């Protein structure tokens, strides 16, 4: 398929989805030309790899051997490192964000937030932390770099550098949903117990709308709970879970 065509990525994605339709989310994930095969055992993995390579050959699609990695316990995939213990941020991306120079224009703010936002599921209260920077991207807002923006910039860098490995969800275990609300936004953490105590599965947050900022504290806390239940419905529906909030 020629490069540069507007619909080329979506068309190729549709084709590759059709090729692997019966295997998708069972033991393979595909994004454009990135193919990830995952298995519970080495024996299953050899069988899965053979099925995928056979299907590629049947459709006259070919993988470049030098770009393939086989039988790995973990590997990078779409900016993440995926392994049997969970999902973490790719170190090259962490280093890029940590070394980002001070922002001096709206365009630079947008670029920084664009990359940071991609990893918001690793950062607790991302919406609250990033609020002073995201305000600078609004139409008609003058670019003024002050203490709030500097603190936001540094806090996001620190959060990225200390981001935890997100544990893979275990449907057999109960979940812990911890919710919080501030004057700026609402956020939640989805966790499950592990040998070392509660471990994060995902983080979620968003800013409050103008009307929501006028809610009393207990209603903002309730809003955070409703938001978390909707956000993680695929995990929580039919599962046991506990909700924690700091408002009584």
List the predicted regions and their residue ranges.
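A short, polar/acidic, helix/strand-boundary loop motif
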Residues: 1-11, 196-223, 247-248
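Acidic, metal-ligating active-site segments
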Residues: 183-192
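Active-site palm subdomain of RNA-directed nucleic acid polymerases
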Residues: 9-47, 122, 126, 230-241
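C-terminal reverse transcriptase regions that engage the nucleic-acid substrate
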Residues: 7, 15, 23-26, 31, ...
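RNase H-like nuclease module associated with reverse transcription
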Residues: 111, 117, 214-248
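Two-metal-ion RNase H-like nuclease active-site motif
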Residues: 174-181
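Secondary-structure transition/capping motifs at alpha-helix termini
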Residues: 22-26, 55-64, 192-199, 231-239
């Amino acid at each position: 398929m020629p490069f540069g065509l507007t619909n080329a990525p979506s068309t190729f994605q549709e084709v590759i989805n059709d090729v692997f339709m019966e295997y998708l989310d069972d033991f393979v994930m595909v994004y454009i030309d990135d193919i990830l095969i995952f298995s519970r055992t080495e024996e299953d993995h050899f069988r899965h790899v053979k099925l995928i390579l056979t299907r590629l050959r049947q459709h006259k699609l070919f993988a470049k051997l030098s770009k393939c990695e086989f039988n790995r316990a973990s590997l990078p995939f779409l900016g993440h490192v995926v392994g049997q213990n969970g999902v973490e941020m790719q170190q090259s991306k962490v280093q890029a964000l940590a070394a980002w120079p001070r922002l001096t224009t709206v365009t630079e703010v947008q670029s920084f937030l664009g990359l940071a936002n991609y990893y918001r599921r690793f950062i607790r209260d991302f919406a609250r932390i990033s609020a002073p920077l995201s305000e600078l991207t609004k139409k008609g807002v003058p670019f003024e770099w002050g203490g709030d923006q500097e603190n936001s910039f540094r806090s996001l860098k620190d959060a990225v550098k200390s981001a935890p490995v997100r544990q893979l969800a275990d449907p057999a275990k109960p979940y812990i949903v911890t919710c919080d609300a501030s004057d700026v936004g609402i956020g939640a953490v989805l966790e499950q117990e592990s040998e070392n105590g509660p471990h994060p599965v995902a983080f979620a947050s968003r800013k409050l709308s103008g009307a929501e900022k006028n809610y009393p504290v207990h209603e903002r806390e309730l809003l955070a709970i409703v938001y978390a239940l909707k956000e993680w419905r695929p995990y929580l529906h039919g599962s046991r879970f506990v909700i924690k909030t700091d408002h009584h």
